Amino acid sequence: ASTPTTKGYAEKADHEGEKMAETYGGGDFQYQFVDGWAKLPEGTTFHECPGVAIDSKDNVYVLTRGEHPIIVLDREGNFVRTFGEGHFSNRTHGLYIAHDDSLLIADDGIHTIQKFSSEGEKLMEIGEKNNPAPKWSGQPFNRPTSAAIMPSNGDVYVSDGYGNSRIHVY
C-alpha cells in the first residue's frame, strides 16, 4: 500500500517497508506508480483520504478529513484549489462526481449528503445536520456512507450504511 508522507506524496512500500513493484496489472491493463505526482502547497497535506474522483475535465478531487476537505489537482498533479472548509465533520466518507461535474459528499459524522459545484459552491444538503435517524429505523440518515446520481433521470441514491443498512432514493 502507499503511505502518506508529510508533504502528501506517497512512497512505495508494503506493510513491512519493502519496496513494491514498479508495474502493476497485466496485458492491456498495466499501471506504474507515479512518485511525487501531487504537488501540494506548503502546509497542505492529504489527511485520511476516504475518497477520490475525477471530473469530465480530468481534474482530480481528493476528499480528506484534514484542514482542507476537498483538494483539487489537475491531471498532472498540479494544485488547483481547495474548498469545503467549515462544511464537514472529521468523518467525511464518500465522494461522487455526477455527469454535470457536481460533487456529492457523504458525511457520516453529521448524517448528511452535501452537493457542491465543481468550483466549491454548496448547492444542496440532504439530511438534518447532527440529527441522526433512530438506528435501524429505515429513516434517513444514520451515518450515510456514499451517494450517486442516476444520469438518465437525476435520482439520488444514498447508501445509509452504518446505522441503517439501507439505500434511500430521492
Question: Which residues does each PLM region occupy?
Answer:
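N-terminal export leaders
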Residues: A1-T3
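Eukaryotic scaffold repeat domains enriched in small/polar residues
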Residues: G17-Y170
